[in-house]
Structure formats: structure tokens, C-alpha cells
């Protein structure tokens, strides 16, 4: 298995209490052991968006109540990591707080959410952020609402992953993108599979050296 020199998630190690399936574990190992051009890795020749699809296929489609909740927990954990970006630029803005309250209630009480809910709360999603980082962070919260509907949950997760890992929603350091990908693999996925939030939220405040210094 690849061991990374730089980052906070440098070794492939799943939580000791993880109960994910053997197929999913094997998929996580496989995608961990690749290098991705999209994530600014030297020698990378793999496509991270294809890895997202590969992992989510092994994770399972949201076709039943438990599988659907797993999607929501995954999206929720990523959204919480992106929330500080919104609060940094717009400390008085409360849409992220509203979404968080809605999701918390949904996880407690369940129920199907209309497909239009996300558009109702974010009618101008393409204009709301003003900066790339906040645009992408708001997109993640928009996607989080979309995961509450089984018809839109799968595509919403793929969009969330793209904005979170290959964008600036969580961290503005290009060198952090692979580390965020690793965090998703070994922290977010096992937790979501067990209907939990990750034990650690990725932080954009974690420092990284310039990309030119990363091998």
C-alpha cells in the first residue's frame, strides 16, 4: 500500500470497529493505491471522478432506508468540514445552519424530502457564494439537501465529492487534495457505513507546503 510523505492521512488504516463489507474494503484499498492527476500527484494517471463512482458503487445504491441514511451521513460529514469556509467569508449567513437543522431532524425522524427543497432554500445557488471556495461550499450544502431524496442522492454525492476533494470548499491548498481524498476513504466512508459522522472533520486550517515541494 502507498504510504504518503505529506499529509494527515498517510497510511491506509480503517477504524478498528469498522463493519464495512469485504468488497468495499477491497475497493478502498484499490483506489488508495493509485495516483491521480486530478489531485496534482506526480506520475498520476488515474481519474478521481472514476474513483468516486467506483467507491460509491461498492458502497451501495440508496435503495433502502439504511443505505439511504448512509448517503446522508457521508454528505453531512463532508458538509460539516466545508461549513467553516462559509462562516469565514459570511459569518452572519445562516443557510448552512438551517440545512444542518433540517438534516439532523431528518436523521431522527426520517421521511422523504421533495426534490425541490434544495432549490427552494438555494434559489440562486450559482450566484450565492461570490468566491470559488464559498461557491463550492454552498454547493455541498445544496447537495446535502439533495441526498435527503432517494432519487437525487447518488448524483448529489458525486457532486459533493468533486467540490470537496478537487475544489476549494474545505481547503485552499492544492497539496491537500490527496489528503482529503484519503480522509474520505478511511474516515468518512467507514463512519457513514455505520450511520455515524467521521470522528475527525478535515480542516482547511491545516497547513501544507507549496505544491512544488510535494513529491
Feature names for model-found ranges:
Residues 2-214:
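Structured binding/interaction patches within domain cores
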Amino acid at each position: 500500500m502507498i504510504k504518503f510523505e505529506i499529509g494527515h492521512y498517510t497510511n491506509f488504516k480503517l477504524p478498528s470497529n469498522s463493519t464495512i463489507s469485504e468488497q468495499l474494503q477491497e475497493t478502498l484499498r484499490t483506489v488508495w493505491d493509485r495516483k491521480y492527476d486530478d489531485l496534482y500527484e506526480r506520475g498520476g494517471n488515474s481519474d478521481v471522478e472514476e474513483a468516486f463512482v467506483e467507491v460509491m458503487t461498492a458502497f451501495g445504491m440508496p435503495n433502502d432506508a439504511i443505505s439511504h441514511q448512509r448517503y446522508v451521513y457521508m454528505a453531512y460529514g463532508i458538509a460539516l468540514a466545508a461549513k467553516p469556509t462559509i462562516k469565514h467569508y459570511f459569518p452572519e449567513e445562516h443557510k448552512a445552519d438551517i440545512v444542518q437543522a433540517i438534516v439532523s431532524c431528518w436523521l431522527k425522524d426520517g421521511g422523504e424530502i421533495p426534490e425541490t427543497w434544495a432549490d427552494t432554500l438555494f434559489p440562486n445557488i450559482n450566484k450565492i457564494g461570490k468566491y470559488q471556495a464559498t461557491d463550492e461550499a454552498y454547493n455541498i450544502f445544496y447537495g446535502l439537501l439533495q441526498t435527503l431524496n432517494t432519487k437525487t442522492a447518488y448524483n448529489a454525492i458525486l457532486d459533493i465529492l468533486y467540490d470537496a476533494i478537487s475544489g476549494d470548499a474545505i481547503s485552499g491548498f492544492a497539496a491537500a487534495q490527496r489528503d482529503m481524498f484519503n480522509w474520505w476513504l478511511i474516515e468518512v466512508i467507514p463512519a457513514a457505513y455505520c450511520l455515524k459522522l467521521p470522528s475527525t472533520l478535515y480542516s482547511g486550517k491545516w497547513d501544507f507546503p507549496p505544491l512544488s515541494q510535494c513529491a
